[in-house]
Regions:
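N-terminal targeting sequences that direct proteins away from the cytosol to non-cytosolic compartments
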Residues: 2-98, 171-174, 179-202
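Conserved polar/disulfide-associated segments of primarily extracytoplasmic proteins
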Residues: 42-55, 84-194
């Protein structure tokens, strides 16, 4: 299974679905997702290429490695064995119908208005609720959750619906959008919380 990502030319840099991929049940650090919603201001909605079966549960014993992006100036964890695509400002990791994408660029700090505008501009995505402000690993952030549907599989006609948690992050003239997507109904909360909380600016 292969995940495809559409990114607009101005890529820069998340409310609520009944069990968003990267939502956390904890209060105080990462907000919990309880309805579907959202994405970023220069990156299009995360897209999946439909496969015959929907798979995506990340095993409890999954090993995570640290990805260091010296060009974009950040590091984050990702599941060992996932395929990496891209470099610099746009990097994705994918496996089956799961996908994690980081988009980094220069720009002012994200505001609620800017996040709302970004989410409203997303094509091919269904966003619900308002951006949620919270603290991620000690730094301010916003989160939006959205759903996006793949094109039909050319053989089976099957479509895959992804639930995507989108995080908006920033620091000193740089900003990032972090998308974590998985098939609707798949519970990757713990793994995606680990990934989102591991993001560090250099």
């Amino acid at each position: 299974m292969r995940l495809l990502f559409a990114v607009t030319a101005t890529a820069v840099a998340l409310a609520v679905v009944a069990a968003g991929c990267g939502s956390t049940g904890r209060s105080g650090t990462t907000p919990s997702s309880s309805t579907a919603a959202a994405t970023t201001t220069a990156a299009g909605a995360l897209q999946a290429e439909a496969n015959a079966t929907v798979a995506g549960d990340i095993p409890d014993n999954q090993v995570f490695l640290t990805f260091r992006n010296s060009q974009a100036g950040y590091s984050m964890k990702y599941p060992e064995g996932w395929a990496q695509q891209g470099s610099g400002g746009v990097v994705t990791f994918r496996d089956k119908n799961n996908a994690v994408r980081a988009i980094v660029s220069s720009g002012a700090a994200w505001t609620k208005a800017a996040v709302q505008a970004d989410a409203q501009a997303l094509k091919g995505a269904r966003v619900q609720g308002q951006p949620q402000a919270f603290t991620l690993s000690g730094r301010p952030a916003f989160k939006v959750v959205y759903q996006t549907v793949s094109a039909p599989n050319p053989v089976t006609g099957k479509r895959v619906t992804l639930t995507v948690d989108r995080y908006y992050l920033w620091k000193q003239g740089r900003r990032a959008v972090l998308d974590l997507g998985c098939p609707l109904g798949v519970d990757n909360v713990d793994a995606y919380r680990l990934i989102s909380e591991s993001f560090r600016w250099n």
